[in-house]
């Protein structure tokens, strides 16, 4: 089975899910699973809202290519960002095409991270998103309202070679996602780093 046949890899573009599939296949094989069963499991698994909420769920809304993923640290965001830019590059031209398709991100993380890790998340986000909407988790884990958002914004401003042209802070996760969708044009890619999956 080639990785582009595995729906969770989005044609092999989601490299982290290629690695996840390899690990799952190896573990299953080590436990005695037959190869045809492993193949069926990997090719039949769809990263839908029902089967794996917050794990690279793809949702198209009025021509906007939306994804929801946790990606709550810089390493996870880098993997997500690389996937998103690869996905963006692979989109076919259509009547909805715009001069420059954008990558829009709703970015947030938990408050129990170190300040430098939250700042690094902001720097990483600026590498991949043209527009960033900064949000906060409802459960701030010991932080003051707006504190995590301020650290993310600091990181975004520290990225000298970033893509970001616009940054907005909307603390409420659902409102941030709605605002991001209102900014998006058909053909844009929108990623929401979600926390409250039921609310989204």
Q: Can you annotate each of these PLM segments?
A:
Residues 7, 11-16, 23-36, 40-200:
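ATP-dependent carboxylate-amine ligase
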């Amino acid at each position: 089975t080639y990785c582009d046949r595995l729906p969770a890899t989005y044609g092999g573009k989601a490299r982290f899910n290629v690695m996840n599939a390899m690990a799952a296949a190896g573990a299953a094989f080590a436990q005695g699973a037959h190869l045809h069963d492993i193949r069926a499991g990997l090719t039949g698994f769809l990263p839908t809202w029902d089967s794996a909420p917050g794990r690279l769920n793809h949702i198209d809304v009025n021509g906007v290519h939306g994804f929801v993923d946790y990606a709550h640290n810089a390493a996870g965001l880098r993997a997500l960002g690389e996937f998103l830019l690869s996905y963006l590059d692979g989109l076919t031209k259509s009547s909805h095409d715009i001069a420059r398709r954008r990558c829009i991100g709703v970015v947030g993380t938990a408050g129990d991270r170190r300040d430098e890790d939250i700042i690094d998340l902001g720097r990483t986000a600026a590498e991949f998103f043209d527009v960033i909407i900064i949000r906060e988790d409802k459960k701030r884990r010991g932080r003051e309202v707006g504190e995590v958002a301020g650290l993310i914004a600091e990181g975004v401003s520290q990225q000298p070679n970033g893509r970001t042209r616009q940054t907005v802070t909307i603390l409420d996760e659902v409102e941030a996602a709605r605002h991001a969708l209102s900014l998006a044009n058909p053909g844009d890619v929108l990623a929401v780093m979600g926390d409250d999956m039921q609310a989204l």
